[in-house]
Curated annotation (Swiss-Prot):
Effect after changing F85A: Loss of cholesterol binding. Abolishes cholesterol transport activity
UniProtKB keywords: Acetylation, Cholesterol metabolism, Disulfide bond, Endoplasmic reticulum, Glycoprotein, Lipid metabolism, Lipid transport, Lysosome, Secreted, Signal, Steroid metabolism, Sterol metabolism, Transport
Gene behind the chain: Npc2
Protein name according to UniProt: NPC intracellular cholesterol transporter 2
SUPFAM superfamilies: E set domains
GO molecular function: cholesterol binding; cholesterol transfer activity; enzyme binding
Lineage: Eukaryota, Metazoa, Chordata, Craniata, Vertebrata
Species for this entry: Mus musculus
UniProt note: domains: Binds cholesterol in a hydrophobic pocket; there are no hydrogen bonds between the sterol and the protein.
GO cellular component: endoplasmic reticulum; extracellular space; lysosome
Keyword Metal-binding appears in the UniProt entry: no
Signal sequence region: 1-19
Cysteine pairs bridged by disulfides in the record: C27-C140, C42-C47, C93-C99
Length: 149
């Protein structure tokens, strides 16, 4: 099981290392500072997300607090309406972060963004938050995306 987890982590790191840093909007990182946001593959702005594919997400950030755990929340925002966007692993401590989280330490958060075939072909904003154990945002970022066939 550890070998499988290590292999997945290695593949995510390789994919993330080939990604270009994205221009993102910080949407309220209260107890952390985002250093870099990478979504791979995402060669254009806005990101073209193709239905049926999964995208690697790598966020490098510095924690401004201690926390025993962390939870990711992802939403699609369309005309001001926030719709939950399910991700495979909402537990930040299982997404490249060694918990407990320490203050002033740099972390690389790794996850996947699956784009389901049943999603409509639309433009929207993806909002991705990682909350600490007190529900404060370790990071919060937004990027515009286009879901396509």
């Amino acid at each position: 099981m550890r070998f499988l987890a290590a292999t997945i982590l290695l593949l995510a790191l390789v994919a993330a290392s080939q990604a270009e840093p994205l221009h993102f909007k910080d949407c309220g990182s209260k107890v952390g500072v985002i250093k870099e946001v990478n979504v791979s593959p995402c060669p254009t702005d806005p990101c073209q997300l193709h239905k049926g594919q999964s995208y690697s997400v790598n966020i490098t950030f510095t924690s401004g607090t201690q926390s025993q755990n962390s939870t990711a929340l992802v939403h699609g925002i369309l005309e001001g309406i926030r719709v939950p966007f399910p991700i495979p692993e909402p537990d930040g401590c299982k997404s490249g972060i060694n918990c407990p989280i320490q203050k002033d330490k740099v972390y690389s958060y790794l996850n996947k963004l699956p784009v389901k075939n049943e999603y409509p072909s639309i433009k929207l904003v993806v909002e991705w938050k990682l909350e600490d154990d007190k529900k404060n945002n370790l990071f919060c970022w937004e990027i515009p995306v286009q879901i396509t066939s």
